[in-house]
Amino acid sequence: MHPLPGYWSCYCLLLLFSLGVQGSLGAPSAAPEQVHLSYPGEPGSMTVTWTTWVPTRSEVQFGLQPSGPLPLRAQGTFVPFVDGGILRRKLYIHRVTLRKLLPGVQYVYRCGSAQGWSRRFRFRALKNGAHWSPRLAVFGDLGADNPKAVPRLRRDTQQGMYDAVLHVGDFAYNLDQDNARVGDRFMRLIEPVAASLPYMTCPGNHEERYNFSNYKARFSMPGDNEGLWYSWDLGPAHIISFSTEVYFFLHYGRHLVQRQFRWLESDLQKANKNRAARPWIITMGHRPMYCSNADLDDCTRHESKVRKGLQGKLYGLEDLFYKYGVDLQLWAHEHSYERLWPIYNYQVFNGSREMPYTNPRGPVHIITGSAGCEERLTPFAVFPRPWSAVRVKEYGYTRLHILNGTHIHIQQVSDDQDGKIVDDVWVVRPLFGRRMYL
């Protein structure tokens, strides 16, 4: 008996659906993809992370020569990650940490196993110690669709302009979207940058789904808090990454607010004891304390949760960061660029009228969330606030040059104006007496 006319079409659709669970038509692939680097916080090291669709060994082959054999080997581990979407797609996330790297030396590497290898990538090992001048690309809110900053970031990376990337929350829009296929597409998109530079992150609100599981699984940050909060040293700076999202998604546990706050205070105390060696303290968190955008986001409220804490009094971060003399606070979330005057409790504390950022008496805030995503740019309120110094409603990203222990150079690159520098400022602070704002 012949099957009904619709039988074969239904069968084919079911077959395609089942194959799609692994992310591609055909047999699941053992070839590495979504390759990216991170700095594990240990001098002379670098972590390589990648994805396969079947379990394989986790190995990195590396060396100094761009062609020919790669004589050095490092092994690691993989963990299966099951996305929380309806298809329960399974990815295998591999991590290998390379150690005893020569500072400032360029390495060539590939990752994978006998079942399949990635192409060759290059990276330059971070220099050790405090006496060098790191250059970073800084941005947030970069999506798989409308990723305006990516082509220029790729060119910058190929030209060796940066030592690391700081992605200040909100990835892909969203990593979990379409049963995490959008996350896969995004990780492939950033590979030309992230496979060559340590790509350091913090979580944003768009990572929240399934308790931030895609963010925690896909990125490999230092520490033992699943990349939600951690710190690391880079040249003359101590960089602290933290989660603003613990203040908003309380159903995952109010205890996380307290845990992070206590960790932050402990880390800031240690950073201040080490201030002679690492004079700059820089923080990165997704949702800003302040902004002058024309929306109803938390940063537009006088008693914002990030600034003042839960119920306006519990675990607020502005007093904490001011107490321990944080120099520079990096934010995103608003799809625009805004630089504030040195500020504390809505009061401007410029160093002087002529040189406001020389020995400022309050932290400097930079909001850089215009790298490009499907939600487009965020407009500003018609009238700037008294504490707002520069506002740019254009796609772009920030360049941060930590020149030495006293000087930081900040520039905003406009993709709308073909790479034009639309903001340029130096922050200057003395080597001594850095903890307290006077």
Swiss-Prot record:
Quote the record's cofactor note: Binds 1 Fe cation per subunit. Binds 1 zinc ion per subunit.
Gene Ontology molecular function: acid phosphatase activity; metal ion binding
Does the entry feature the keyword Lipoprotein, yes or no? no
**Subcellular locations according to the entry:** Secreted
EC number of the protein: 3.1.3.2
What Gene Ontology terms describe where this protein resides (cellular component)? extracellular region
Q: Which Gene3D superfamilies match?
A: 3.60.21.10, Purple acid phosphatase-like, N-terminal
- Keywords for this entry? Glycoprotein, Hydrolase, Iron, Metal-binding, Secreted, Signal, Zinc
Cofactor dependence is on: Fe cation; Zn(2+)
Chief place of localization: secreted
What reactions does this protein catalyze? a phosphate monoester + H2O = an alcohol + phosphate
Which residues are the signal sequence here?
1-26
Q: Name one Pfam family in it.
A: Metallophos
Residue sites binding Zn(2+) per the record: D170, N205, H286, H333
Record-listed Fe cation binding positions: D141, D170, Y173, H335
The record's InterPro entries line, in alphabetical order, gives: Calcineurin-like_PHP_ApaH, Metallo-depent_PP-like, MPP_PAP, Purple_acid_Pase-like_N, Purple_acid_Pase_N, Purple_acid_PPase_C_dom
- The residues that carry sugar chains are N211, N350, N404
Tagged with keyword Cell division: no
Q: Which PANTHER family match?
A: ACID PHOSPHATASE TYPE 7, PURPLE ACID PHOSPHATASE
Q: Which family would the database say this protein is a member of? A: Belongs to the metallophosphoesterase superfamily. Purple acid phosphatase family.
Name by which UniProt lists this protein: Acid phosphatase type 7
